[in-house]
Amino acid sequence: MKRKKITIVGAGNVGATCAHWAAAKELGDIVLIDVAEGIPQGKALDLMEAAPVEGYDSVIIGTNDYADTADSDVVVITAGVARKPGMSRDDLLNINAGIVRKVTEEIVKYSPNAYLLIVTNPVDVSAYIAYKASGFSANRVFGLSGVLDSARFRTFIARELNVSFEDVISFVLGGHGDDMVPMVRYTYVGGIPVEKLIPTDRLEAMVERARKGGAEIVNYLKTGSAYYAPSASVMQMAECILKDKKRILPVSAFLQGEYGESDVFSGVPAIIGGDGVEKIIELDLDDEEMAALRKSINSVRNNISKLG
């Protein structure tokens, strides 16, 4: 039986950590590709030399040649410029748009049947670019958004209540930016609505912290951005495809009438399985929640309109 093949584009902190998660989860063989000579090769060799210690059997190679990525099942695109203190995800728009377009064209040439998972910020716009550049069906291109944003929100709730992280379930909708919409009404702790456990003012503070979660880490690091949680989140998405897990996850998916929106990517709950985004789930939103989602999606549309 042939192993699955995962290509990770970009050998920076996010990409290399994605490769580590993929190997640790035994998701398949891994290709780490980057324009910088020596970086993907060195990191791939380092990761493979950890295999005897960690007990995985993934073959990991580093390369600068897209021919080595041929016939990939899943491609994770992390390539791009990282945020610096004071920058928003949207500030990266024009720089990263060209990178994502070029990478996508190379990937399609060698892996026409792959699923594309987009991490490059601003994620929702990058996913739109990759979708248009690839010519793939909408189910095969989606971005990291709500899995990461929800993980941050869940972390803050679990720490507030001193309970297991696993017992907190939540969704974050909308674009992966400052207008994201943490869904307090759909947040549960061990099956109990979170609003029954945490006062409103504390919840509002956690919502705001989740929105600024990436910037908080950027401000600490000074010269980089988050990578452990983003890479863990996107590899959870990859695992759902490769193992046909059919989990309901909030991802940046292409909307075709759902939530009254079309021709735009936004974070929404979806069933993720062997066929990628198999179904987008439409939550029953009240007027305030829908208005917040519309505002978030309009921010994504505004950025798309700025593309050259």
From Swiss-Prot:
Binding site for substrate: 83, 89, 121, 152
Role this protein plays: Catalyzes the reversible oxidation of malate to oxaloacetate.
Reaction catalysis annotation: (S)-malate + NAD(+) = oxaloacetate + NADH + H(+)
Organism: Desulforamulus reducens (strain ATCC BAA-1160 / DSM 100696 / MI-1) (Desulfotomaculum reducens)
GO BP term, pick one: lactate metabolic process
Catalytic machinery residues: 176 (proton acceptor)
Residues given in the record as NAD(+) binding sites: 10-15, 34, 96, 119-121
UniProt-recorded name of the protein: Malate dehydrogenase
NCBIfam families reported in the protein's UniProt record: MalateDH_bact (TIGR01763), PRK06223.1 (NF004863)
EC number(s) reported in the record: 1.1.1.37
UniProt keyword Methyltransferase, yes or no: no
InterPro entries: L-lactate/malate_DH, Lactate/malate_DH_C, Lactate/malate_DH_N, Lactate_DH/Glyco_Ohase_4_C, Malate_DH_type3, NAD(P)-bd_dom_sf
Family that this chain belongs to: Belongs to the LDH/MDH superfamily. MDH type 3 family.
